[in-house]
Amino acid sequence: APRLENIGKRMQAVKMIHDLDTRFRLMDEFGNYGHVISLPNPPLEDITEPEVGANLARVANDAMAELVRKHPDRFPACVAALAMHDMDATRVELHRAIRDLGARGVQIFTNIAGKPLDIPKFQPVFDAMAEYDLPIWMHPARAATMADYASEERSRFEMWWCFGWPYETSVAMARLVFSGLFDRHPDIKIVTHHLGGMIPFFDGRLRPGLDVPGRPPPAEHPPAVLS
C-alpha cells in the first residue's frame, strides 16, 4: 500500500520481530520472561481488500496460537489480529480466536483505514470484548503520507513516527472516552501501546484545554466525562 511504503523496511530492521531465535536470545537476557504475542504493523486494513484481510487475520491467529502451543514458556498467550474493514468477518474471527484458539484479547489500531474507532460501525468489537471481559490492545496507525502540515504531501524527518504515533494513540483514546464508551462499558479493558501515548504526561495541558473558564463545555462532551 502506498501509504505504508517504508514500514516493511522498518520492521525488517528490527530482527526480533520476525526471527524467533533472535527474540529468544533477547528474552534470555531477562531471565524468566514471557511475551504475549501480537501481529506487528502494518494494519491489515491498510494493505488488503476486505476478503483478503479476513483470510490473513485467520492465518495470523492460527500461527500465533500454534506458537503459544509450541513455546508456552516463552509465549503464555496471544492476542488476536482483526481485519476491521468487514465487520461481519471481524465478529466471526473475534469469536473464533477467543473461543477456539484461546486468544486472551484482540489488537486493533487507532484508526481503521482513516476512520475513527468511535464511530458506530466499530462498536461491536468493544461490545464483544466487554462481554468477554478481555482486553483490547490498541496500536497507533500513522504513516509518512500523513503530512505534518496541510501545505505538504507527506511527513518529514520521521515526525509521523516519533510524534505522530503518540498523538494518534492519545486522540483515539480521548475520543473513545468522550464518545461515552466507558459510560456504556465501565469495566472495559484497553491496553494502549507505548505507555499510553501523550496522555499520561500531559495532565497539566489536558485539564485547562478541556475546562476553559467562562465557557460551557461542548454539547458533544458527555457531562460524566467532564465532572
Task: Enumerate the predicted regions with their spans.
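Helix-coil boundary/capping segments in enzymes
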Residues: A1-S227
